[in-house]
């Protein structure tokens, strides 16, 4: 059972859009997509009040940089529990991780959340302890008891060239331990952040500030990696409101986008993952 109410009219519109891909001569493309689409009736909804439709929303895919949303929420949870110290450097890393999608910043965040560091291969008891610590974020996600999170994996750093040393070992010989998320899991977390339903309302407001994207054309031209152009936000008018976290690599392009026509209008959000 999803966290939103199934809406037959939305399901029909989504199916028509997928049929349109077939009509455009791309009949196999729909099988490379995973989608969760939710709309609300109130301008300031609470969690669980949405209605929506989906396609392949339970499929676990490599999320690329969308996983950084989960790491940002984890930071706020760790801070609330006094598990890590507050610092200007941590906040700088948080901003760069979400606003600019910095992999370097994400590396620091994962180190702080798990008490681990990258480096040469480890063995024996040291390796077992390291891997146990690296799974702390997964343990927290399971403690939320959200059914959408049951099969997810959020334990790896994000890379430009790829992992080395103990990080490569932790990926597994067949990369079977890569990060993995579904659109419905990501949708549940995005809704929680945007409705103040995870960690605390003040923490969610800080996270919302990091996720906010400018739709101003001049600002977007000045930043070629703005996480708007080439993603769902590109189709919005400049006066709309957008909060999002994108992910991209050579084989895939993902987006988690929450948007409103104005502060007085009900929001919608869409999670779109692609795979090769």
Where do the protein language model's features map onto the residues?
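Penicillin-binding protein/beta-lactamase superfamily catalytic region
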Residues: 160-220, 265
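Conserved small/polar residues in nucleotide/adenosyl-binding loops
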Residues: 273-276
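Active-site Gly/Thr loop motif
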Residues: 224-259, 263
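Short, well-structured active-site flanking segments
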Residues: 77-96, 106, 200-203
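Active-site SXXK
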Residues: 61-84, 97, 269
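A short, well-structured edge-of-sheet supersecondary motif
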Residues: 13-55, 259
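Active-site-adjacent helix/loop patches that line small-molecule binding or acyl-intermediate pockets
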Residues: 2-22, 27-32, 89-184
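Short glycine/serine- and small hydrophobic-enriched flexible loop segments
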Residues: 73-81, 111, 188-195
């Amino acid at each position: 059972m999803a966290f939103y109410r199934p809406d037959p009219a939305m399901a029909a519109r989504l199916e028509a859009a997928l049929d349109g891909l077939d009509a455009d001569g791309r009949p196999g493309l729909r099988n490379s997509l995973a989608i969760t689409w939710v709309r609300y009736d109130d301008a300031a909804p609470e969690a669980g009040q949405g209605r929506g439709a989906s396609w392949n929303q339970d499929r676990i895919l490599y999320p690329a940089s969308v996983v950084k949303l989960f790491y940002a929420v984890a930071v706020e949870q760790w801070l609330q529990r006094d598990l890590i110290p507050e610092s200007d450097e941590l906040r700088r890393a948080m901003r760069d991780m979400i606003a600019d999608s910095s992999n370097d910043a994400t590396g620091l965040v994962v180190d702080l959340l798990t008490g681990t560091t990258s480096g040469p291969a480890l063995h024996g008891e040291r390796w077992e302890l390291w891997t146990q610590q690296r799974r702390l974020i997964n343990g927290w996600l399971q403690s939320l008891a959200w059914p959408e999170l049951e099969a997810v994996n959020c334990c790896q750093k994000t890379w430009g060239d790829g992992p080395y040393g103990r990080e490569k070992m932790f990926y597994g010989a067949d990369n079977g331990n890569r990060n993995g998320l579904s659109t419905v899991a990501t949708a549940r977390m995005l809704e929680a952040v945007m409705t103040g339903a995870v960690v605390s309302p003040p923490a969610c407001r800080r996270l919302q500030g990091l996720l906010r994207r400018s739709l101003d054309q001049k600002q977007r031209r000045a930043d070629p990696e703005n996480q708007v152009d080439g993603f769902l936000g590109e189709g919005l008018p400049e006066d709309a409101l957008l909060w999002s976290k994108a992910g991209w690599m050579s084989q895939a392009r993902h987006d988690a986008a929450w948007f409103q026509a104005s502060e007085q209008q009900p929001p919608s959000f869409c999670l779109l993952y692609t795979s090769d």
